From Swiss-Prot:
GO CC list: cytosol; nucleoplasm
Keywords for the protein's UniProt record, in alphabetical order: Cytoplasm, Developmental protein, Metal-binding, mRNA processing, mRNA splicing, Nucleus, Repeat, Zinc, Zinc-finger
Biased composition (Polar residues): 333-342
GO BP, sorted A to Z: mRNA processing; negative regulation of myoblast differentiation; regulation of RNA splicing; RNA splicing
Database matches in InterPro entries: Znf-CCCH_4, Znf-CCCH_Muscleblind-like, Znf_CCCH
Molecular function GO terms recorded: zinc ion binding
Disordered: annotated span: 316-342
SMART domains: ZnF_C3H1
Protein name: Muscleblind-like protein 3
Cell compartments where the protein resides: Nucleus; Cytoplasm
Length: 342
């Protein structure tokens, strides 16, 4: 299986801006640099009330004479830059999770290619397994220890699967705050330093689609130097809330990048079996240790059948009943009646 290169694909959703409807009707009283919606020229392609901003224009390198993409004004350009950074973080997280998923799939494919434990009665035709067809001989399958890695072995388990049809948790937004609806009606009894929603002083800060305001990140970091900032400056209690939400989002992203519990199981290192005659140490390379455990148990077995050259048609039963060689019989001096005595 060839490795898969996960490349970041450019997504144009974060470059999309909503077109000002009043501008389309010709009744917008705000200038291009003041309206929070896009005022595209006629050469730009508008689809379903939205227009795509020019990526090269954001980088300051667009050389087209009549560009079909929108060249946004500075206040919309800064908004698109924030959207681009958030989109880049999401793409990197998705790419890392995809690479992790592919690694687990490759490990599962390698594990499935291993031969399964033999449990076939027809294996009794093998002379080395004739004494018990359901138990692997302790000496079978042994390989030199130098050919295998010395570290522990990691095998893939069953990672937790998401249930279909169950909606996931709503993502936390750390760059936006919901505007207090009671404050918009003029009857909010809580002060600006007590309400958990935003009380913006400028109506142009409010996003109509979701009734929220964009947070000034420079103000939270204590370095906003704009005289009239178009972003919302939250009070101290909302700043603490935003920091807690940002910390929770980073913690969730770190947990998503980590391996899920049970995905990898650690098998302890298997010790090599030293040979008494000084030969190369060997051990059983099976994934599970049941064969080695059975081999170490004191199980009564039948007599050992030596491996000797057999003629065609010979069976293990004929070999077991063969007469042992004369060299193994102890010498005993005997006398017969026909022997002459001097």
């Amino acid at each position: 299986m060839t490795p898969v290169n996960v490349a970041l694909i450019r997504d144009t959703k974060w470059l999309t801006l909503e077109v000002c409807r009043e501008f389309q009707r010709g009744t917008c009283s705000r200038a291009d640099a003041e309206c929070r919606f896009a005022h595209p020229p006629r050469v730009c392609h508008v689809e379903n009330g939205r227009v795509v901003a020019c990526f090269d224009s954001l980088k300051g390198r667009c050389t087209r004479e009549n560009c079909k993409y929108l060249h946004p004004p500075p206040h919309l350009k800064s908004q698109l830059e924030v959207n681009g950074r958030n989109n880049l973080i999401q793409q990197k997280t998705a790419a890392a999770m995809f690479a992790q998923h592919m690694q687990l799939m490759l490990q599962n494919a390698q594990m499935s290619s291993l031969a399964s434990f033999p449990m076939n009665p027809s294996l009794a035709a093998n002379p080395a397994m004739a004494f018990n067809p359901y138990m692997t001989h302790p000496g079978m399958g042994l390989v030199p220890a130098e050919l295998l890695p010395n570290g522990p072995v990691l095998i893939s388990g069953n990672p937790p699967l998401a249930l279909p049809g169950v909606p996931g948790p709503k993502p936390i937004r750390t760059d936006r705050l919901e505007v207090c609806r009671e404050f918009q009606r003029g009857n909010c009894t809580r002060g600006e330093s007590e309400c958990r929603y935003a009380h913006p002083t400028d109506v142009s800060m409010i996003e109509v689609t979701d009734n929220s305001v964009t947070i000034c990140m420079d103000y939270i970091k204590g370095r906003c130097s704009r005289e009239k900032c178009k972003y919302f400056h939250p009070p101290p209690h909302l700043q603490a809330k935003l920091r807690a939400a940002h910390h929770q989002m980073n913690h969730s992203a770190a947990n998503a990048m980590a391996l899920p519990h049970g995905a990898l199981q650690l098998i302890p290192k298997r010790s090599a079996l030293d040979k008494a005659n000084g030969a190369t140490p060997v051990f059983n390379p099976s994934v599970f240790h049941c064969q080695q455990a059975l081999a170490n148990m004191q199980i009564p077995q039948q007599a050992f059948i030596p491996t000797v050259p057999m003629m065609h048609g010979a069976t293990p039963s004929t070999v077991s009943t063969a007469t042992p060689p004369a060299s193994n019989v102890p010498y005993v001096p005997t006398t017969t009646g026909n022997q002459l005595k001097y």
